[in-house]
């Protein structure tokens, strides 16, 4: 892999974790689109697996080396970006689980009745969408 590409993926990974941490610490307020809230999530995305902190920590600890394995074997930039975003989101939420025993969800979209989420969740979601796009394109 090219050294410049390595730095690009490392930058994306680091930036997503940094933005997640900063937003959770400093962000607050509302505008017409969304509110910044501080909500404790003891489960996973969409409110599933409530009070399964240990399971989610173990799952993340297993998932991260698997992501790294596939990242190192990947030839596609789309796949590498998808895996980078998923890894960053996983680490962002893992940090919360390790330090607080819950994930701090901070974003609430005003016009949707939807669970609160955070930047790590957004990173995971975009990464998962890109992964699906990659898988669909690679089947053709």
Listing of model-derived features with the role each one plays in the protein:
Residues 1-140:
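Alpha-helical transmembrane bundles and membrane-interface segments of multipass inner-membrane proteins
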């Amino acid at each position: 892999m090219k050294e410049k590409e390595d730095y690009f993926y490392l930058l994306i990974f680091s930036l997503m974790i940094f933005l997640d941490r900063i937003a959770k610490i400093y962000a607050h307020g509302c505008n017409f689109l969304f509110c910044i809230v501080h909500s404790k999530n003891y489960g996973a995305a969409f409110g599933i697996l409530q009070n399964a902190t240990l399971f989610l920590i173990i799952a993340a600890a297993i998932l991260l080396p698997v992501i790294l394995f596939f990242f190192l074997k990947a030839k596609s930039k789309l796949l590498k970006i998808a895996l980078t975003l998923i890894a960053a989101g996983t680490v962002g939420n893992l940090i919360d689980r390790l330090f607080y025993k819950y994930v701090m969800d901070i974003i609430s979209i005003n016009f949707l009745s939807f669970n609160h989420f955070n930047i790590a969740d957004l990173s995971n979601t975009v990464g998962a969408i890109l992964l699906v796009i990659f898988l669909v394109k690679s089947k053709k």
